[in-house]
Amino acid sequence: MKICLNTKIAGWYAACIFLQSCAAPADKKTIENITPAAYYSAADFTKVKKYDTHVHINADDSTFIDQAKKDNFRLLTINVNSGHPIEEQRRIALILTKKFHDRLAFATTFNLDNWGTEKWQPQTIAYLKESFEKGAIAVKIWKNIGMELKDANGKWVMIDDARFDTILNFIEKSNITVLGHLGEPRNAWLATDSMTIAGDKRYFTEHPQYHQFLHKENPSYEDQIRARDNMLSKHPHLRFVGAHLGSLEWNVDELAKRLDKFPNMAVDMAARIPHLQVQSVKNWQKVHDFIIKYQDRLVYATDHGVEPKSNFAEVNKEVHDVRISDWKYFVTDEEMTVPDFSEKFKGLKLPKEVIDKIYLTNAKKWFPGI
């Protein structure tokens, strides 16, 4: 009995230390005193060990991983409740993590089969438990919760629904990270010609079912964010990474409010760096200072990946070019352009210490076992 109690106390103490370390903002004086030697250059790209914590590798092919090796990246491949059956995604992930154990980790997910019945919770916990035993270091929760799932009465089911609490509690007790893609970028609720990013215009044109501007009956953008925030309030010790800048990509001030409120929350940058860049056009200093202040809560990621029918050479060139552009934005102060919008902007030239956190140490901190 004493041993169990001590273990619980130790676990509680460790959780407290983790949350305290997340809540503490960077010391601004330290950053201001950085010397020129403490900055990386564009030429350092391949020299620095890095993580891309959000990719989707759904083909038993090594070329995507080979490209990561050339770019000096380790990867986290994400299973998601969309497309291929989740069991097949896990099978591929296990093959590849065995082959490339020093280069690749994987995140599992769960499906919604039998939702609303007595079978759903036990089957979900059983699948997650098996995934953790096979090496999964995170659980992906996808936007179909909040955007597609309805109960038997036709009511929308959001992530703060009490029926998810048992699952979230199990994940927390297992010391596993939740990666949550909940909601969509705010552009999804705008007309296409009002969207700020070309990539969003293209995506929502190709996937009109997620273009919420066309579906006024669906939950609002604010509903999505509120449900996610409610879930975090109910689970203050759940280690949570909000995918895609936590669907708050449009305004660093709004994202800062959540990072202040929820010390157990970080965000990945997958497919949302152009949203930071477009904000840099109007207020470079605000974006720069935001990243400095929340340098312990930001994790680099791209959201690239491969499918069995992918043109691997094209995908590898695209992800390499994106990584090079992102690196230039973060480490230099050069004038830049990107395909997502026409305006020019300046790189952020972040100190080495900050770059190392975004690309390396934060991945290890928020995804233990990566």
Predicted regions and their residues:
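Bacterial N-terminal signal peptides that target proteins for export
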Residues: 1-12
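C-terminal motif of bacterial Sec signal peptides marking the signal peptidase cleavage site
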Residues: 20-21
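An N-terminally biased module of ancient metal coordination in phosphate/nucleic-acid-related enzymes
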Residues: 24-103, 122-123
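Active-site gating/metal-coordination segments in enzymes
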Residues: 38-43, 91-219, 266, 273
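Hydrophobic faces of well-ordered beta-strands that scaffold small-molecule active sites
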Residues: 51-55, 75-78, 104-109, 139-141, ...
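Acidic-and-aromatic substrate-binding clefts and catalytic sites of carbohydrate-active enzymes
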Residues: 54-62, 80-89, 113-122, 149, ...
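Generic structural signal for hydrophobic
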Residues: 67-68, 131, 171, 231, ...
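H/E-rich (His + Asp/Glu) clusters that bind or coordinate divalent metals
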Residues: 216, 220-230, 235, 239-370
